[in-house]
Amino acid sequence: MSDAAAYQADGRSVSRAAFYTIACDPRRSVVVEACAGAGKTWMLVSRIVRALLDGAQPNEILAITFTRKAAGEMRERLDEWLREFAAPGLPHERLVEALQERGVPAQQAETLAPHLAGLHERILDAGRGVEIRTFHCLLYTSPSPRD
């Protein structure tokens, strides 16, 4: 199967790179339909990273998924990536590559690479991280406090 057959945006076939440029852009609203193992977790966590790089505060992000397992995988992936990107001695080129994989244009990736390296520390300093929950968290919300 070619990239063009596997990825669609706005009803037309696009390359993998074009798809991730669109899908990982936090300024866009997207719907992703894909089978298990197709990379939805990668894409959703990439959107979170991109939103943080665009200036969103960690406590302003709420990711909702269907299962505890998926929520746990998303939390683990985000933590793993942030630690990896903050690792001392990680080459600047690797940070640029990671950003480009997530749809950031080359010139912008060069500029954002140092910010990506500092993202883990920024989240720790914020005190409250990104909320990644299951949709069940919405069911336990009460319209008013109990007496």
Across the structure, where does each feature detected by a protein language model lie?
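P-loop NTPase Walker
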Residues: 2-142
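A short, hydrophobic C-terminal helix/tail in secreted or cell-surface proteins
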Residues: 143-147
